[in-house]
UniProtKB/Swiss-Prot annotation:
Belongs to the TFIIB family. It comes from Saccharolobus solfataricus (strain ATCC 35092 / DSM 1617 / JCM 11322 / P2) (Sulfolobus solfataricus). It comes from the Archaea. The keyword Phosphoprotein does not apply. GO terms for biological process: DNA-templated transcription initiation; transcription preinitiation complex assembly. Sequence repeats lie at residues 107-193, 204-285. The gene is tfbB. This is Transcription initiation factor IIB 2.
């Protein structure tokens, strides 16, 4: 923030006690009596926060009712049995018959995304996709786990999380035909949601490949330049980004005399040598590579 008086950048600070924004360079008061949107209490640990908090958690698409529900407590209840019965009744009426399918799918999604150690924003993206699919009736006649896996894989691509398709297929024993059928439904729904287009690029996979093959960073730099050039020229369309990145790393490592065999590269990434060879051929057929000594 720039001071309107002395025009100094990043010199404005907030005085919490007086509620004023002050310039540290010229001492001008930019604004006084500023409203503090934070809580009216202070907490120094988790216990303090739990005792003083008077509001619930923020809304989230990971829960069928977006988190807007009532929880009946029994900490100070005189009749514990009556309170317990009320809790059970409240839990039953909280989910309407039409929401049962959504509750089941979101429960599976939250469990599996935690097992895969995916970040919260990926879970929320997948939850929004699943909600839209339930609304449009695209969750019928399809295996629930296959649908969840497809939604999580697509959400990783939307949020620039480089996770390979093979990781999901091997973990859940899903056939290629089942997965692509589910992914087709996910893509159909995601196209109707603004901002839900895949943003990931082939170069995102290269750090993982370098780590698994124990290669120096310079190879990653050159391999990234190569796959970025292919991506800009439209040569990556319809090709697996992981295998394309792996082939570029294989080629650059060979040119820099830090050789890795195709088998070593393929085995470290759970892909076939044939895939590496095909992507390698795509690279050398489209580029004239000149090595300057």
């Amino acid at each position: 923030m720039k001071c309107p008086y002395c025009k100094t950048d990043n010199a404005i600070t907030y005085d919490v006690e007086k509620g004023m924004y002050v310039c540290t360079n010229c001492a001008s008061v930019i604004e006084d009596s500023a409203v503090d949107p934070g809580p009216d209490w202070r907490a120094y640990n988790a216990k303090d926060r739990n005792e003083k908090e008077r509001v619930g958690s923020p809304s989230t698409p990971k829960v069928h009712d977006w988190g807007f529900h009532t929880i009946i407590g029994y900490g100070r209840a005189k009749d514990r049995l009556k309170t317990l019965k009320m809790q059970r009744m409240q839990n039953k009426i909280r989910v309407s018959p039409k929401d049962k399918k959504l509750v089941t799918l979101l429960s599976i999604l939250n469990d599996e995304s935690s097992k895969l150690e995916l970040p919260e924003h990926v879970k929320e993206t997948a939850s929004l996709i699943i909600r839209k699919m339930v609304e449009t009736g695209l969750t019928k006649r399809i295996d629930q786990y296959t649908l969840i896996v497809a939604a999580l894989y697509y959400s990783c691509q939307v949020n620039n999380i480089p996770r390979h398709l093979q990781e999901f297929k091997v973990r859940y024993s899903i056939s290629s035909s089942e997965f692509w059928s589910a992914l087709k439904r996910v893509q159909y729904v995601a196209n109707s949601i603004p901002g839900f287009r895949p943003k990931i690029k082939p170069a995102e996979y290269i750090p993982k490949i370098l780590y698994k093959l124990n290669l120096p960073p310079i190879i990653g730099t050159k391999a990234s330049e190569l796959v970025d050039l292919m991506h800009k020229q439209g040569l990556t369309s319809g090709k697996g980004y992981l295998s394309l990145s792996a082939a570029s790393v294989y080629l650059i490592s060979a040119l820099m005399d830090i050789k890795k065999t195709q088998k070593e590269v393929a085995d470290s990434l759970d892909i076939t040598e044939v895939t590496i060879r095909n992507r390698y051929k795509d690279i050398v057929d489209n580029f004239d590579i000149v090595v300057t000594l």
